[in-house]
Amino acid sequence: MSGTLVLVRHGQSDWNLKNLFTGWKDPDLTELGIQEANAGGAALAEYGIKFDVAYTSALVRAQHTLKLILDKVGQPDLQTIRDQALNERDYGDLSGLNKDDARAKWGEEQVHVWRRSYDVPPPGGESLRDTGARVWPYYLTEILPRVLHGEKVLVAAHGNSLRSLVMVLDKLTKEGVLALNLATGVPMVYKLHADSTVASKEVLGDMSGAH
């Protein structure tokens, strides 16, 4: 068995609360989001893991989540690598719009297709497949080698960037990943074999509140 990979979706952001398409826009966490990140950190502290390195996106809501988690596990000065390859899916022309307003403008069915299809992007934005096309190569070249070296690696990122990873790690179909929702602030602990396949997966919290 090789190293450990922990994935955490950022806590609730201001725009999650306001029901806005966020994407690459950069709101911070709400009070609830801070609580969620702290809860995830407390779960990891209780689990007893100490990390060798952390990765996060170029967006403040993921970076803030990571900082809160690292404080909880007693590693505030851990090496942290930030890269936009781990950013949320880019919603293009939908970014900043209220989801109800978007449905009024383009129709509920069209917005549903943009949100929930695998390979149909919104205007000027990315599909889930597009998101995976930047996340997965970054994982393979930057993150996975450290896990396979036996390190314990923490990744704090976003719903869709993490779904892109989980799709491959959990061997989900396109239909399976579209049905997958990740709760905010809930760590997923993967232990990997030396051949990079998953040896075990443990969820430290409740995924039933995912959205």
Curated annotation (Swiss-Prot):
Q: Which residues form the active site?
A: 10 (tele-phosphohistidine intermediate), 88 (proton donor/acceptor)
Which residues are marked as site: Transition state stabilizer?
A: 158
Pfam (any one): His_Phos_1
Asked if the Swiss-Prot or TrEMBL record annotates the protein with the keyword Transmembrane helix, the reply is no
**GO MF annotation terms:** phosphoglycerate mutase activity
TM segment ranges: none
From the UniProt record, give the pathway where this protein acts: Carbohydrate degradation; glycolysis; pyruvate from D-glyceraldehyde 3-phosphate: step 3/5
Q: What class of enzyme is it?
A: isomerase
Where along this sequence does the record place binding of substrate? 9-16, 22-23, 61, 88-91, 99, 115-116, 159-160
SMART domains annotated for this entry?
A: PGAM
Q: Could you tell me what reaction this enzyme catalyses?
A: (2R)-2-phosphoglycerate = (2R)-3-phosphoglycerate
| Isomerase among keywords | yes
Record Gene3D superfamilies: Phosphoglycerate mutase-like
Q: What PANTHER family does its record include?
A: PHOSPHOGLYCERATE MUTASE
Known partners and oligomeric status: Homodimer.
Provide the family line: Belongs to the phosphoglycerate mutase family. BPG-dependent PGAM subfamily.
- Role according to the record: Catalyzes the interconversion of 2-phosphoglycerate and 3-phosphoglycerate.
Q: What is this protein called?
A: 2,3-bisphosphoglycerate-dependent phosphoglycerate mutase
